[in-house]
């Protein structure tokens, strides 16, 4: 995308890095991360380039935080439009990094497998080092029931497909025809699915009721810059 202001090659490189980091994690990189990625000897060199980008109006620097970088104007619009450029494929990785291709699951139809092709909205490409445990798919979060666990409406939950989970882990569970994200707690007689928001009740699964674990939450991609 052509910007209204002229950037040097190095400034464009740093701007691309900021956009990629925000798309990948929901947060901009630190000065140290920029310096390390681009081979600067110190974070001060990164700061000088950031100040130049701020003067040109493509970013805003926020004092008091190591990740205080906000995209503005054309730079922000360019990031928001990037998800539509390749026919449903959206890259959340930096150039040169090994990638995982993860299907994004939207709404799940009643009674059908969660990874059925009709549920796949698009494919995201992410760095294979982004998550400690490798996910099999991304699930778009709907609602605020897991708010206090930091999982917000519109976030992309990275899920490892499994039928097993331990007490206290956050799982994707199927209850009859519904799929939900909750914290698992097994008691002697019942299974409890706990929300992380006091406005939402605990779901109690009685013996004999339809219940199945579909996957385990292994990471999160913020919705901040994916709208």
Swiss-Prot record:
DNA-binding region: 31-51
Keywords: Autocatalytic cleavage, DNA damage, DNA repair, DNA replication, DNA-binding, Hydrolase, Repressor, SOS response, Transcription, Transcription regulation
GO biological process: DNA repair; DNA replication; negative regulation of DNA-templated transcription; proteolysis; SOS response
Pfam families: LexA_DNA_bind, Peptidase_S24
Site (Cleavage): 110-111
Active site residues per record: 145, 182
EC code: 3.4.21.88
A GO molecular function held by the record: serine-type endopeptidase activity
Source organism, top-level taxon: Bacteria
Catalytic activity: Hydrolysis of Ala-|-Gly bond in repressor LexA
InterPro entries: LexA, LexA-like, LexA/Signal_pep-like_sf, LexA_DNA-bd_dom, LexA_repressor, Peptidase_S24_LexA, Peptidase_S24_S26A/B/C, WH-like_DNA-bd_sf
Assembly and binders: Homodimer.
Biological role: Represses a number of genes involved in the response to DNA damage (SOS response), including recA and lexA. In the presence of single-stranded DNA, RecA interacts with LexA causing an autocatalytic cleavage which disrupts the DNA-binding part of LexA, leading to derepression of the SOS regulon and eventually DNA repair.
UniProt similarity note: Belongs to the peptidase S24 family.
HAMAP family hit by this protein: LexA (MF_00015)
The protein's name: LexA repressor
Source organism: Variovorax paradoxus (strain S110)
The gene coding this protein: lexA
């Amino acid at each position: 995308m052509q910007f209204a202001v002229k950037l040097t090659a190095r400034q464009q490189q740093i701007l691309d890095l900021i956009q990629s980091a925000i798309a990948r994690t929901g947060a901009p990189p630190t000065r140290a991360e920029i310096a390390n990625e681009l081979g600067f000897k110190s974070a001060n060199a990164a700061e000088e380039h950031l100040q130049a980008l701020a003067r040109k109006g493509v970013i805003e620097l926020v004092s008091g935080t190591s990740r205080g970088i906000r995209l503005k104007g054309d730079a922000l619009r360019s990031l928001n439009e990037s998800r539509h450029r390749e026919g449903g494929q959206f890259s959340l990785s930096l150039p040169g990094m090994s990638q995982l291709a993860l299907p994004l699951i939207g709404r799940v139809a009643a009674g059908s497998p969660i990874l059925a092709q009709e549920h796949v909205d698009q494919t995201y490409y992410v760095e294979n080092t982004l998550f400690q445990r490798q996910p099999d798919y991304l699930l778009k979060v709907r609602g605020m029931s897991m708010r206090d666990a930091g999982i917000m409406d519109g976030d992309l939950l990275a899920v490892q497909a499994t039928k097993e989970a331990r007490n206290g882990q956050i799982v994707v569970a199927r209850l009859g025809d519904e799929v939900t994200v909750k914290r698992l707690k097994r008691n002697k007689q019942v299974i409890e699915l706990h929300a992380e928001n006091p406005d939402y009740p605990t779901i109690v699964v009685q013996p004999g009721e339809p219940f199945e674990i579909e996957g385990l939450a292994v990471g999160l991609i913020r919705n901040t810059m994916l709208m």
